[in-house]
């Protein structure tokens, strides 16, 4: 792989020319359904169809009243109002769904912004995938997604998963024509956009970008996966069906009750019934019943969920959480266990060589000062260390800013290159001058890597360089000449690991022409151990607080790391996970973990805090064991080998700098790799669930009131207490507007003080049910009492109720019906604020960050006043103007809903 440095790559001018000629590396999305078709799709909704039927019935009744009864043109205001309500409901629903679609499309954009390592003007640098052009030289390594079509220049044991294009899960790629697979779909030296590197590394020269790639010719846009039915979505489907059936039953009851009441006026003597009037009455009754069904059915629930998800996904992206699968938003809020990597997630992933211990002919070098001296001399021992670090590596440095070089590739290997660079050793020159004979890439199972080269610093020598986990590398060594006994090396390692430093061991051997790398292992008999470097990776400043927040929220955190037990324990101690009370039962090594039977693991799994020296499949087995304990598991991963665990977990969390294979297997990508962002994802998941509960609380409370009021009105034999257009306005408030207001509520950090919810628990819990029945019942009793008073007394202004005298039945006047309608709306207007404060200890008037709620509530209030007071609007809703005193009494009286809740909350908080 070292021969890569003979390539210069494109200049800036050549990049511009190539982009102008061949275009950018972005796939054109497939054509979408035209907006007008998407809008018309809304009219296929069963509830909209019911409303359209109600509108047609209203038109028929209005025509009868206008022609048959010679009434004025104002009879057409109601059908016009119905159709306006229909278009308003469909229009708002269409608008917010298109907005949500735009939010979900962010996945494609982020995918195009992923970093790619290229060589330009002789320098290694990182660019966005969208900026790759034809002619670019791109470095590809294990786990990465190939950014464009290209031809291999150099390849080391390269295997590519082409299943997305050819169905072949593993294709071996090479630049050696003698090894070409002549039966392969594509030439063995050609790699294709969208396929993934499963093993090895290579350099490729781009030959096609964007739509010109093979992938571009069969491209289907990546989408947010919303196909998974979560417990919440299943509950909401069942709830919607149950409410729909109940609403239809109430609708039938209203029809029967109104017909019976109508015929009772004529002692059920059909001869006395005016047929046309009776038909008109039945049509009106059917219209009221259908409207009641529309009002009762929670058709706003899907929109509330969609809006909540879209809003949450957009805001989560701002906190470095890219949601790839929609169900993960909800599931993250129910997480009970987080299995996390150490490097980069708990630590800063800013590695630097802090200590070194090299062994030269019995001379111990146990300080970084001594190690620096060795690097600067010209002995063979020094040359072995310098050359071994420089050539036995897949990392590079971006030296475009010499004052602040940055690492490209593995951060641990990069720390070694930075160490050489800081001491004036030109690692690039060393790579240029050697001839690489063969390589053995690093794997998590092997835990070491090896490279055979024709040495540049020691001419005439062929050298094998090995680097990896010190204990593994030491055990490979046959020569102990000048090297302390293993016990002494282990003691040195333990000192480093107790300081939470990552260690690497080095070895080398001069060899002949024989092949020493066979079947993925090295076969030598005189490998000599050179020494150890200790690399520091400080804990992220915010992690201890975030770990504490998770523990306080009832979430267990488990560290799964490839580091040693001592290193892992020290990191655990620094982040607040490992305490003095913990014992050997709380930590286990990868081999010990693998040796456990399932029964033994099930008995131990909840106590395990750290798995050290973990192997890839250990993480997946840990996830499965936790799931057997009914835990909701989130797991982090950044490598290709993490994909099985990411898929097995309830929520897979890939890292922003992880491989494409890991990202594709995950549900959420943590862009900044930080554990704090994982903690934020939990908070967003819990808040999303709470917002949906708030919407249900508000809507079902309004449902109970509206349904019972209309049914009771029918049984009392009165005129319908609410007209069709009034019910549609109420429906608009509690469905569309409430969905908009409550779905956009910001997350509350207070949710992190609660224990995780039971993922299978029904979303309507006991406190919600009690409030729905209690508040809905209170509103119903209040409105029925008012309806009874209006039916048996002549109310000229609202203050008359204080001294009212109940008399015989009388017709409810338009003024009284307007009072009833306005009181209904205003009580629920104030209850909207109560719903916002549900399950919190905050005041309902704590509106910081609730811009959407404030805007929507203001809109509801202003619109209600306008429809009652503006002459042009009154006719649509069959209302009349109210007196200023009436408004004052209604507003003050209705607000008692709010103040009673505030008083109760105050008393509860004091207790």
What are these regions (language model features)?
Residues 1-756, 761-764, 821, 838-911:
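Conserved cytosolic headpiece of P-type ATPases
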Residues 630, 682, 686, 781-793, ...:
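Alpha-helix capping/termination and helix-coil
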Residues 702-706, 774-783:
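Core segments of transmembrane alpha-helices
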Residues 714-723, 789-815:
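Helix-coil boundary and interhelical linker segments in multi-pass alpha-helical membrane proteins
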Residues 734, 815-832:
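Generic alpha-helical transmembrane segments
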Residues 759-777, 807-819:
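Membrane-water interface at loop-to-transmembrane-helix junctions
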Residues 778-793, 864-875:
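Alpha-helical transmembrane segments and their membrane-interface junctions
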């Amino acid at each position: 792989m070292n021969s890569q440095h003979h390539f210069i790559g494109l200049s800036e001018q050549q990049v511009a020319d190539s982009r102008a000629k061949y275009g950018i590396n972005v796939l054109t999305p497939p054509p979408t359904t035209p907006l007008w078709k998407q809008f018309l799709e809304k009219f296929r909704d069963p509830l909209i169809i019911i409303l359209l039927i109600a509108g047609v019935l209203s038109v028929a009744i209005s025509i009868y009243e206008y022609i048959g009864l010679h009434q004025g043109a104002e009879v057409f205001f109601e059908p016009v109002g119905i159709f306006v309500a229909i278009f308003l409901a469909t229009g708002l629903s269409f608008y917010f769904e298109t907005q949500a679609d735009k939010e979900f499309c962010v996945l494609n954009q982020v995918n195009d912004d992923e970093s790619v390592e290229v060589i330009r003007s002789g320098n290694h640098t990182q660019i966005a995938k969208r900026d790759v052009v034809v002619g670019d030289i791109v470095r590809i390594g294990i786990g990465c997604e190939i950014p464009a079509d290209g031809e291999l220049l150099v390849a080391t044991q390269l295997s590519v998963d082409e299943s997305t294009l050819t169905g072949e899960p593993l294709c071996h790629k090479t630049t050696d024509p003698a090894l070409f697979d002549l039966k392969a779909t594509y030439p063995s030296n050609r790699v294709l956009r969208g396929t993934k590197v499963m093993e090895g590394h290579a350099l490729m020269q781009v030959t096609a970008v964007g739509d010109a790639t093979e992938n571009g010719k069969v491209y289907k846009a990546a989408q947010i996966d919303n196909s998974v039915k979560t417990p919440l979505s299943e509950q909401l489907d069942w709830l919607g069906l149950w409410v729909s059936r109940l609403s239809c039953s109430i609708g039938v009851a209203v029809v029967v009750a109104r017909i019976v009441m109508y015929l009772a006026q004529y002692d059920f003597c059909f001869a006395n019934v005016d047929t046309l009037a009776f038909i008109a009455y039945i049509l009106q009754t059917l219209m009221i019943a259908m409207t009641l069904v529309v009002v009762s059915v929670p058709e706003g629930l899907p929109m509330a969920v969609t809006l909540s998800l879209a809003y949450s996904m957009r805001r989560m992206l701002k906190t470095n959480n890219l949601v790839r699968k929609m169900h993960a938003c909800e599931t993250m809020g129910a997480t009970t266990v987080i299995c996390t990597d150490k490097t980069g997630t708990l630590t800063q992933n800013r590695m630097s060589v802090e200590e070194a211990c090299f062994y030269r002919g019995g001379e111990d070098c146990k300080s970084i000062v001594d190690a620096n001296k060795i690097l600067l001399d010209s002995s063979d021992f020094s040359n072995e260390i310098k050359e071994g670090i420089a050539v036995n590596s897949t990392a590079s440095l971006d030296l475009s800013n010499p004052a602040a070089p940055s690492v490209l590739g593995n951060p641990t290997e990069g720390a070694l290159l930075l160490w050489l660079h800081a001491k004036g050793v030109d690692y690039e020159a060393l790579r240029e001058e050697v001839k690489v004979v063969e390589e053995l890439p690093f794997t998590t199972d092997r835990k070491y890597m090896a490279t055979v080269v024709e040495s540049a610093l020691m001419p005439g020598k062929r050298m094998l360089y090995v680097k990896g986990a010190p204990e593994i590398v030491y055990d490979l060594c046959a020569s102990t000449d000048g090297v302390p006994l293993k016990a002494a090396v282990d003691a040195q390692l333990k000192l480093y690991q107790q300081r939470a430093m990552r260690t690497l061991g080095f070895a080398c051997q001069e060899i002949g022409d024989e092949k020493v790398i066979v079947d993925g292992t090295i076969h030598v008999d005189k490998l000599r151990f050179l020494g150890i470097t200790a690399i520091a990776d400080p804990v992220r400043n915010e992690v201890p607080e975030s770990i504490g927040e998770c523990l306080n929220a009832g979430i267990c955190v488990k560290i799964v790391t490839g580091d040693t037990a001592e290193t892992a324990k020290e990191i655990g101690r620094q982040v607040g996970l490992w305490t003095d009370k913990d014992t050997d039962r709380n930590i286990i090594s990868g081999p010990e973990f693998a040796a456990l039977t399932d029964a033994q693991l099930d008995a131990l799994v909840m106590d395990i805090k750290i798995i050290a020296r973990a192997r890839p499949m250990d993480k997946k087995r840990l996830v499965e064991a936790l799931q057997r304990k009914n835990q909701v598991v989130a797991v982090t991963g950044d490598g290709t080998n993490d994909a099985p665990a990411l898929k097995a977990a309830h929520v897979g969390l890939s890292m922003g700098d992880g491989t494409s294979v890991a990202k594709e297997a995950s549900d959420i990508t943590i862009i900044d790799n930080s554990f704090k962002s994982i903690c934020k994802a939990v908070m967003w998941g819990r808040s999303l669930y709470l917002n949906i509960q708030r919407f249900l609380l508000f809507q079902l409370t309004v449902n109970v009131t509206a349904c019972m009021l209309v049914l009771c009105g029918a049984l009392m034999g009165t005129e319908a207490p609410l007209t069709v257009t009034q019910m549609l306005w109420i429906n608009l408030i509690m469905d569309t507007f409430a969905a908009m207001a409550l779905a956009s509520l910001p997350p509350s950090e207070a949710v992190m003080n609660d224990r995780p919810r039971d993922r299978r628990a029904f979303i309507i819990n006991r406190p919600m049910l009690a409030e729905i029945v209690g508040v809905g019942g209170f509103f119903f009793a209040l409105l029925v009492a008012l309806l009874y008073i209006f039916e048996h007394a002549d109310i000229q202004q609202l203050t008359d109720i204080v001294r009212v005298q109940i008399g015989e039945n009388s017709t409810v006047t338009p003024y009284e019906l307007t009072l009833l309608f306005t009181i209904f709306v205003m009580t629920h207007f104030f209850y909207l604020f109560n719903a916002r404060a549900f399950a919190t200890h905050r005041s309902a008037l704590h509106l910081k960050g609730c811009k959407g709620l404030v805007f929507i509530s203001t809109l509801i209030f202003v619109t209600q006043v306008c429809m009652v007071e503006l002459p042009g609007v009154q006719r649509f809703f069959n209302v009349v103007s109210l007196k200023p005193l009436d408004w004052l009494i209604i507003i003050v009286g209705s607000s008692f809903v709010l103040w009673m809740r505030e008083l109760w909350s105050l008393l509860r908080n004091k207790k």
